[in-house]
Amino acid sequence: MGETATDSEHRMMIGLSDPMKIDPKRDRFPCCIVWTPLPFISWLVPFIGHVGICREDGVILDFAGPNFVCVDNFAFGAVSRYIQINKEMESSRSSSSGMFNGERRYEQEEDSHEKEPTWDDALRKSTQEYQHHSYNILTCNCHSFVANNLNRLSIKSGGWNVVNLATLVLFKGRWVNKTAIVKSLLPPLIVYTIGILLGGWTFIASCSILVVLLTGWFIIGTYCFKKLIQL
């Protein structure tokens, strides 16, 4: 079967010439960032969702509650969108000139004589760290966990946070299938249709305020008060 234009564009975006096998039926997404909508919250703010990161064998890891990282049991349902990462081409760990500030903190914790950690090694360290973190949707959430992993891996020279991670998934995430599109977009469409019919401009204004407040919180908490949003 020939490669579609979408397939080719996605490969170019992530730098893959031969992507690892993805199997949505078995929930296997090797070296991927994965996303699924959150009940109720995503119905009002569709670009907000739950994210996880996958091991090399495709098993999903996601920070789903206080001191709890799910393994191979993605919270809130099946994966709807994903981004596969070429770990060899995307990592800049070996480039000292491209080292991001956050990575220095992680490297100081490790023995300089140890061999360079693998993808799964980095995910294991982040998992162990977040098993001692309290969960808070506003300050320490699933996006914090995935950003922590990406920084350990020095993906795209690091500097990952909840804002640029959410932006990446929103604009670069690839839909798993048509069912995933319907599952993600139909509930917001229904809610907004009913809300506009019943509430009119009041409903639109309320949703707009909610979007501005949530977006503003994470942007200000990430870039103005850097200790507020944990990574």
From Swiss-Prot:
Origin superkingdom: Eukaryota
Subcellular locations according to the entry: Membrane
GO CC annotations, alphabetized: endoplasmic reticulum; Golgi apparatus; membrane
Basic and acidic residues biased stretches: 102-119
Alphabetized Pfam families for the sequence: RTE1
Keyword match Transmembrane: yes
Bilayer disposition of the protein: Multi-pass membrane protein
Chief location: membrane
Protein's name in the database: Protein RTE1-HOMOLOG
Source organism (scientific name): Arabidopsis thaliana
The organism's taxonomic lineage, starting at the top: Eukaryota, Viridiplantae, Streptophyta, Embryophyta, Tracheophyta
